[in-house]
Each structure stands twice: as C-alpha cells, then as structure tokens.
Amino acid sequence: YSAQVACDKYGWALAYSVEAGNIHDSQAFPALFAKLEPLKPQFIIADSGYNIPSIAKFLIDKEITPVLPYTRPRGKKDLLRPKELIYDEHFDCVICPEHQALTYRTTTREGYREYKSDPAICANCPLLSVCTTSKNHQKVVTRHIWKDYLEQCEDIRHQRGMKELYQHR
C-alpha cells in the first residue's frame, strides 16, 4: 500500500489517503486534495511525483500556488536536451539548434502534441548524431497541452521565498 499525507508547516497531519501500492502519487492526489480543499490551502508543496501537467493546471486554476521541485530531464544523456529546442508559441512549432522548424502533426490521446522535423533536411544536419537515433532521420518532439502550467510552476519555484517554503515539505 501507499500512504499520502498532507501536513501543515508545523508537521501536523491535515489529511491522508491510503492507496494500493501500484498507484502513482499523481493518481492518488485527487482523493487527498478532496480532504484538503475545505481547509482552503494557499500553497501546495509536494515532491516530484506530483510535478505533472494535470496537477499543475488543477492547482493554478484553483488559484493555489504549487511549490514543486526541479526534475531532471529524462532521456538519453548523449542527445540534445529539451531546453536546446525552442517552442515558438506564435507559429506553434519547435525550433532546433540548426534553426529548422519541427511542425505540428497530431495530438495524442494523452494530451501530447507531436512536432516532427523534415527528414530530408535532417539527413544532412551536422547535429544529426546528437539529435535523433531514428532510422529515417526524423526528430519527434512532444509537448503536453498543459506544458505552460508546468512552466508557471518552474517560475514560481524561482520566486523569492519558495526555496525556503519547499524545505518545509
């Protein structure tokens, strides 16, 4: 089993939920928050298991400040990092370090928008070996439809006093 416990700044338990051991923290959050909501929290300070787009959107929409930790980029270490690819909100595309646009193709059922490069251009790219390992030389980038909420959480994390607040977690 897995126990989720919400505490106040003094460490007193305010609410808890117990879930099956195979339930991820993010899936257990709604039941725990339902018990916390009547207390009208201003901040929710949580570990990286809760640092997902749906929880970020949920809290921000309810005007509750999420204080969530930095999470390392996942993926292969010898490939380009996500921060090296720039999302252009105006044109809804992703720009690679070689200034080529990865254009929007589809949105998955899980809420991820897929952006793909032109394989003909990528085949001759000097960064191909550190960009993609695909056989057809096509870079595919996914961006969640609620990624902007995660970016807001990242901005909050850097605000004055948030590091100290997070240490009370």
PLM features: what roles do these ranges have?
Residues 1-169:
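Anion-binding and metal-coordination hotspots
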